[in-house]
Amino acid sequence: MKRLAFLLFASACASSGTTVENTTPKQTPIFQSAETGTLMTDRPRATAISVAAPASNVWLAVKSVYAEMEIPVVVDNPAMHQLGNSNFAKSRVLAGHPMNEFVDCGSGMTGPKATSYRIYISLLTQVSGNADGTTTVQTTFVPMGQDVSGGSSDRIPCGSTGRFEQLFLDRIKATLGK
């Protein structure tokens, strides 16, 4: 009898019809070749802060931080408050820090690949004034690496550790505090 009760209970649980929601993040193709197939990654996400300062002051602080970090600016749209560069290269060091502090391209036999690869970076910043007088700063940092020791000219997707974005936004706040 106990066995029959257990089987009835187990079958009732199995047919309860629970639905599982798919929470897998949507990925986009970023590279495709015959050798590697299609590489997928998450879409780049902006890191944002809100500061208690007018957008015009924040805009000047952002420009100052780009110059301080020696990041060449090619997108400079004051009307839309957009600033940055969608394709610049750095090797070994970024903003005075070792590249592997900010970028993860995986590891090879000699250590982190970000320390020896040429890193191509897209860094774009948007400054938006809010109705309450604060300003939102959103910055998007997307690194890709290229092995310069071999004959390959292909760039591979790299990840961000999140530390660069934090340093960048912290320096904006520090510049505003001066």
Give names to the regions the model predicted:
Residues M1-C13:
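Sec-dependent bacterial lipoprotein signal peptides
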Residues A14-K178:
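Ser/Thr-rich, low-complexity intrinsically disordered terminal regions
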